[in-house]
Curated annotation (Swiss-Prot):
The protein, known as: Aspartyl/glutamyl-tRNA(Asn/Gln) amidotransferase subunit B
Keyword field: ATP-binding, Ligase, Nucleotide-binding, Protein biosynthesis
UniProt-listed Enzyme Commission number(s): 6.3.5.-
Native source organism of the sequence: Lachnospira eligens (strain ATCC 27750 / DSM 3376 / VPI C15-48 / C15-B4)
Enzyme class: ligase
Organism classification: Bacteria, Bacillati, Bacillota, Clostridia, Lachnospirales
One GO term (biological process): glutaminyl-tRNAGln biosynthesis via transamidation
Signal peptide: none
UniProt keyword Protein biosynthesis present: yes
Subunit record text: Heterotrimer of A, B and C subunits.
Cited InterPro entries: Asn/Gln-tRNA_amidoTrfase_suB/E (IPR017959), Asn/Gln-tRNA_Trfase_suB/E_cat (IPR006075), Asn/Gln_amidotransferase (IPR018027), Asn/Gln_tRNA_amidoTrase-B-like (IPR003789), GatB (IPR004413), GatB_C_1 (IPR042114), GatB_Yqey_C_2 (IPR023168), Gln-tRNA_amidoTrfase_suB_CS (IPR017958)
Length: 483
């Protein structure tokens, strides 16, 4: 078999975090009864006229600045003409000729430490389509226009990626950057971030591109990785068998791990683009652009360096924390309250991530940091109570599980469940003396040189005091009394 190379470019659609749609005042809230967030504009009624949501321009330009794009200061909208039941106007308002952002790039770091630059061809603004719901039992399809007119940006990369790993690194960098901006929550499972994979293969060393396919319906990074590997293998098998790869759009079925052809892949001329006559061109002034640049937040790489320098965190901790804007918010707010950065980091990377994994296992889908609802104040309170020896570590973990699940009040939970640590030496001494008297064999083992036997005695003391004893004091008393 010849040596083949995969060539990948991505079209990433990101739903912007505006409260209303791109050209009307309807809500963009996810969920809701079908067709409850609609009006004549977003359902394409004759005579209705679009009015541009300024926040969409702000978010699109901000993402462009964050990805090193050139901002088109005079841009406009075009109509992309096609018929489909979820498209009530029979055209989509998009940008072809003068997109808002061009010629950007993001730098990614691969698992072996290699740095790679992925170029961005353009970022353009557009409106989303509605959603078709197929009822196989009744044999009918329904359409929900709640999503119709929701603002999107489409980030079109150059075909610079050569592996699934590079694709995931690029998408992770994009998602983190956009979340830091607050431009979108980028939840793949809810469709607020969607990636279409354009993929072809060619002999390694060739400068000619192969015939590309576009793969859709990719709802997680894991699905994207599986789809890339499957499509690469499919195209290589076709070429090796002397058959042609057809330029087409394919739909990925992640349960069965295969794709099937949906339709032939269209080119721009198939959509008969022309300037939208109902929308005036957009002018982005130098002053407005300077204002947007000044509002750019501290992004992952800068924040990571600061965490290492300012808080003395190990590089690994700083890398994990800054992967998610939500983690950084919890870390910074909790640290500001309790002034224990390493302990806050340990709780996020330990107990928080453990509970997130358990939640993922229960639901069968990845539980993301953005779904966390507990307050940083609660975490800081737990850490402070442990530091003051008012509760022990076991109680702290119990409390945090309830904070994670229900955001309970920490003080109230401690009081209600009697979790305050016993630090009274007299009470502890009496219990320790009884445990020593009740466990002569463990005492003999300890005195005979089996130092680990003291662990059993500590455990028995903790059990006798219902887990409320100060374990450090218990250990010290045992060593004193067993001399």
């Amino acid at each position: 078999m010849k040596d083949y190379e995969v060539v990948i470019g991505l079209e990433v659609h990101v739903e912007l975090a505006t409260k209303t749609k791109i050209f009307c005042g309807c809500s963009t809230e996810f969920g809701g009864a079908p067709n409850s967030h609609t009006c004549p504009v977003c359902t394409g009624m004759p005579g209705s006229l679009p009015v541009l949501n300024k926040k969409v321009v702000e978010y699109a330009a901000a993402v462009g600045l964050a990805t090193n794009c050139t901002i088109t200061q005079d841009c406009k909208f075009d109509r992309k003409n096609y018929f489909y039941p979820d498209n009530p106007q029979n055209y989509q308002i998009s940008q072809l000729y003068l997109p808002i952002c061009r010629n950007g790039h993001v730098d990614v770091t691969l698992s072996d430490g290699t740095e790679k630059t992925i170029r961005i061809h353009e970022i353009h603004m557009e409106e989303d389509a509605g959603k078709l719901v197929h009822d196989e039992w009744e044999g009918v399809s329904y359409v929900d226009y709640n999503r119709s007119g929701v603002p999107l940006i489409e980030i079109v990369s150059e075909p610079d990626m050569r592996s699934a790993e590079e694709v995931i690194a690029y998408l992770t960098k994009l998602r983190t950057t956009i979340q830091y901006l607050g431009a979108s929550d980028c939840k793949l499972q809810e469709g607020s971030m969607r990636a279409d994979v354009n993929l072809s293969v060619r002999e390694r060393g060739s400068n000619e591109f192969g015939t590309r396919t576009e793969t859709k319906n990719l709802n997680s990074f894991a699905a994207i990785e599986r789809a890339i590997k499957a499509e690469t293998a499919r195209q290589i098998d076709l070429i090796e068998a002397g058959e042609k790869v057809v330029q087409e759009t394919r739909r990925w079925n992640d349960d069965k791990e295969y794709s099937y052809a949906m339709r032939s892949k269209e080119d721009a001329q198939d959509y008969r683009y022309f300037p939208d006559p109902d929308l005036v061109p957009i002018h982005i002034s130098d002053e407005y652009l300077a204002e947007l640049k000044a509002k750019q937040p501290e992004f992952k790489d800068e924040k990571k360096a600061r965490y290492i320098e300012e808080f003395g965190l190990p590089e690994y901790d700083a890398e994990i924390l800054t992967d998610s804007k939500k983690f950084t918010e919890i870390f910074e707010e909790a640290t500001a309250i309790c002034n224990q950065p390493k302990k806050v980091s340990n709780w996020i990377m330990g107990e928080t991530m453990r509970l997130m994994k358990e939640e993922s296992a229960k639901t069968g889908r990845e539980f993301r940091a953005e779904e966390l609802t507990f307050s940083p104040e609660s975490l800081a309170k737990i850490i402070t109570l442990v530091e003051k020896k008012e509760i022990n570590n076991a109680a702290a973990k119990e409390i945090f599980e309830h904070v994670f699940a229900e955001n309970v009040d920490v003080d109230a939970y401690v009081e209600e469940h009697g979790l305050k640590q016993v630090n009274d030496e007299g009470a502890l001494r009496a219990t320790v003396e009884k445990v020593i008297a009740d466990n002569p064999q463990s005492v003999a083992d300890y005195k005979g040189g089996k130092k680990q036997a003291i662990g059993y005695l500590v455990g028995q003391t903790m059990k006798a005091m219902q887990g409320k004893a100060n374990p450090g004091m218990v250990n010290a008393l045992l060593q004193e009394l067993l001399k």
